Amino acid sequence: MDVAAAFLERLDRACQTWGEVNPQEFAQLVRDLERVASPLQFEVLAQAFADDHYLKQEYVGRLLARLNPPCSRPLNELLPQLLPGWNLSIEQLPRYLAGVFGRAALLDALDTVDRTGAQGHTKTKTVRYWRRSIDIQQDR
């Protein structure tokens, strides 16, 4: 089993074992993900957004915030793949996307998604909400 598959298996096991984010398990997930080649880390983490599983996405959101892995895919390609399964409570995904691509690029990509009507307005509206929240916190 490769390191990416082992990481995903451990993530699934953590979600089945614990009813909330377990600090020791999170620390192990950080170590496991650091063994995955840096360019692949985001691709591995993005798989958690395939379905709306809160705990799995919470772990992944914290990993995105902690490790800030690079992302080589264009934002306009990512959003239609990530938004359908994204749990609206996971604020780390919009934070990550704004940090990696910039706030203006994120807003432009959200406008594109809205024009296509593919994801529904609720998801893009919530990303905008989290983005504004980020701006307010940074202004303090």
Please give the residue ranges for each predicted region.
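Alpha-helical interaction segments
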Residues: 7-8, 16, 76, 91, ...
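Structural motif
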Residues: 51-54, 84
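Short, surface-exposed, polar/charged, turn-prone segments marking secondary-structure boundaries
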Residues: 109-111, 121-124
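Structural detector for internal amphipathic alpha-helices that build alpha-solenoid repeat scaffolds
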Residues: 16, 21-36, 51, 58-69, ...
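HEAT/HEAT-like alpha-solenoid repeats
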Residues: 85, 113-119
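Short acidic, glycine/proline-enriched loop segments that cap or flank alpha-helices
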Residues: 82-85, 94
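Amphipathic alpha-helical scaffolding segments comprising HEAT/armadillo-like alpha-solenoid repeats
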Residues: 1-13, 35-48, 69-81, 103-114, ...
